[in-house]
Amino acid sequence: MTADSAVLALVRELIARPSVTPDDVDCQLLLAQRLEHAGFRCETIARGDVTNLWARRGNAGPLVVFAGHTDVVPPGPRDKWDSDPFVPTERDGYLYGRGAADMKSSIAAFVVAAEEFTAAHPGHDGSIALLLTSDEEGPAVDGTVIVCDELRARGEQPDYCIVGEPTSGDVLGDTCKNGRRGSLSGRLTVKGIQGHVAYPHLARNPVHQLAPALAEMAATEWDRGNEYFPPTTFQVSNLRAGTGATNVVPGEAVVLFNFRFSTASTPEGLKQRVHALLDKHGLEYELDWELGGEPFLTPRGPLTDALVAAIRAETGVAAELSTTGGTSDGRFIAKICPQVIEFGPCNATIHKVNERIELASLEPLKNIYRRTLENLLLPR
């Protein structure tokens, strides 16, 4: 079996397992069996309905980790798909199926890359590990974060981590994520006095009180970003008030909002500024906060250089380092690993009907991962 067909065969096996969060459907068991044959020690770290796999080969440093998730989002209406989302289907140069791009192809490519690398260089420097979870697309409370806590408790610290998220845009290799913005959400409840719209002097309209404060929040420059991050953004995601009647002044207004923030801001700093702004407008309010994740950044260095060089050698593409997009499990790994980068296939169809990956990209993806291991773990 050729290397590219080995990747294709494995990703087909993974897609055929309908591993919607948090159900792993033995994806990790399949992978562990292969990794054990390549000399990896495999350990399942389960929590609730979530399955996590930690597989490591070697004991020395540096420790290079590949991180990924075996779970996928629900397929949505199956009648909208041109083929069964859990029957891997090759058509017009693409492989279709839920998880094809996000991120079962990355997992298959790295496993085969690790098999090739360890077979060719059994005495390589350092160690290689895989961290896989079935809880990335869901709450993400019993997945990667639990494994990171366990690794921290026993002093097992990765030096480099590649997260196999689908980061590429137009072509394989054009984008790597060397950081991600943080996510801070708020639920703001502004108190008013319900009443009849014909007697506004007997009521207090929380929407009228909220509007100027909300406008100021939307117009505020929270920071200017920095070399790696765009400026922090503020967005309202939901606004609710009233009973549905046209003649009743609402008794309260509820706003859900979110900051995507850079390393130029901190959660506490953003919270303090929001409270000061609301207090300035004289609002009676309650505000609950939820920190979805802090920003992380890997400056240019050994890991970024190794991956960018591997991409150029395999594809000729000059990869761009970017911090745009949503959060990922990289936010948990960055707390125990000094260098984290995300790289994987094109992301145009992730979470969509007819999710797909170009068949011709599977072997280059595997080769990029293998070349990165060579750049990090072989004498230069």
From Swiss-Prot:
Cofactor: record remark: Binds 2 Zn(2+) or Co(2+) ions per subunit.
Primary role: Catalyzes the hydrolysis of N-succinyl-L,L-diaminopimelic acid (SDAP), forming succinate and LL-2,6-diaminopimelate (DAP), an intermediate involved in the bacterial biosynthesis of lysine and meso-diaminopimelic acid, an essential component of bacterial cell walls.
Entry keyword Metal-binding: yes
Cofactor: Zn(2+); Co(2+)
Taxonomic placement: Bacteria, Pseudomonadati, Pseudomonadota, Betaproteobacteria, Burkholderiales
Quaternary structure, from the entry: Homodimer.
Pfam families to which the protein is assigned, alphabetical: M20_dimer, Peptidase_M20
PANTHER family named among the record's database cross-references: ACETYLORNITHINE DEACETYLASE (PTHR43808), N-ACETYL-L-CITRULLINE DEACETYLASE (PTHR43808:SF31)
Functional pathway: Amino-acid biosynthesis; L-lysine biosynthesis via DAP pathway; LL-2,6-diaminopimelate from (S)-tetrahydrodipicolinate (succinylase route): step 3/3
Superkingdom in the source lineage: Bacteria
Protein known as: Succinyl-diaminopimelate desuccinylase
Catalysis performed (reactions): N-succinyl-(2S,6S)-2,6-diaminopimelate + H2O = (2S,6S)-2,6-diaminopimelate + succinate
